[in-house]
């Protein structure tokens, strides 16, 4: 599962196409953060993700919640961020896993429901270096201390 852009479908949800990109040396995270509600992507701080499996699990859960009308957020993309969190608090999930003002390594998720949207052209509005989506790349940017902090349920902090 390595490549510059990871593009795949989940077998039981063939109507969704998932695109995952990773950027390093991002210079416009403040601009992206100010437009989060307008842009049809999930922007995730790469320091909080250690593997493709972790990300794929969150994407799968977000699609499940969408398909069974159990979404707790407004979009499938924000549902991906919530699905990374051990907490069910949306604001807390966005603060822990979403991008911040100075975020320099970003993971971008774009989920397209094939019947409803135009094909994705790969433009995620990120000014940075596109790097391969792989466990090796995630492990270089992941901060294990931050991961320990964000993955502890809120009542344990």
Curated annotation (Swiss-Prot):
Pfam families: CGI-121. It is found in: Nucleus; Chromosome, Telomere. The keyword tRNA processing applies. InterPro entries: CGI121/TPRKB (IPR013926), CGI121/TPRKB_sf (IPR036504). The keyword Protein transport does not apply. Keywords: Activator, Chromosome, Nucleus, Telomere, Transcription, Transcription regulation, tRNA processing. Its main location: nucleus. One of its GO terms (biological process) is tRNA threonylcarbamoyladenosine modification. Component of the EKC/KEOPS complex that is required for the formation of a threonylcarbamoyl group on adenosine at position 37 (t(6)A37) in tRNAs that read codons beginning with adenine. The complex is probably involved in the transfer of the threonylcarbamoyl moiety of threonylcarbamoyl-AMP (TC-AMP) to the N6 group of A37. CGI121 acts as an allosteric effector that regulates the t(6)A activity of the complex. The EKC/KEOPS complex also promotes both telomere uncapping and telomere elongation. The complex is required for efficient recruitment of transcriptional coactivators. Belongs to the CGI121/TPRKB family. Component of the EKC/KEOPS complex composed of at least BUD32, CGI121, GON7, KAE1 and PCC1; the whole complex dimerizes. This is EKC/KEOPS complex subunit CGI121. The lineage of its organism: Eukaryota, Fungi, Dikarya, Ascomycota, Saccharomycotina.
